[in-house]
């Protein structure tokens, strides 16, 4: 029989930073990112941009462990996963502030800065990056236009 103390200890170790909507270990999310990065390399892509919104947050929740607070603002959201390196979480302004205490991702930015972010990535690579896009069907035109060349 498992002791109560052992159960509590296991629960506290789920997320070593004490963050997260799902209470899954940060290592679970890092493993998901690593798998995507391996696929990006295999398909010769520089990155994947995953888009969700406040009504269908599943894509970004899967990678970021953040569930948006949709009663305070519209919450377009995205996760930028580069072939190598750390991921970036994009949220609406109020949700971006809230996510700092919840998501395991440390680089959290306003979704309104997508265009500048991608321009900087293009500059760093010396060319337009080759990025996959997930969630395109639910992405508002104003955001998809910011990702156009």
PLM feature spans:
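N-terminal accessory/capping or targeting/presequence segment of soluble
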Residues: 2-120
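Non-catalytic accessory segments adjacent to catalytic cores
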Residues: 113-149
């Amino acid at each position: 029989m498992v002791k109560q103390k052992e159960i509590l200890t296991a629960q506290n170790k789920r997320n070593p930073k004490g963050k997260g909507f799902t209470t899954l270990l940060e290592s679970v999310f890092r493993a998901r990112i690593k798998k995507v990065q391996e696929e990006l390399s295999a398909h010769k892509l520089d990155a994947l941009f995953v888009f969700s919104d406040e009504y269908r947050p599943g894509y970004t929740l899967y990678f970021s462990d953040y569930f948006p607070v949709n009663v305070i603002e519209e919450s377009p959201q995205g996760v930028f996963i580069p072939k190598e390196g750390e991921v970036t979480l994009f949220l609406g302004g109020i949700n971006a502030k809230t996510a700092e205490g919840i998501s395991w991702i440390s680089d959290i930015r306003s979704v309104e800065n997508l265009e500048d972010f991608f321009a900087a990535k293009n500059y760093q690579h010396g060319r337009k990056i080759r990025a996959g896009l997930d969630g395109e069907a639910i992405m508002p035109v104003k955001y998809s236009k910011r990702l156009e060349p």
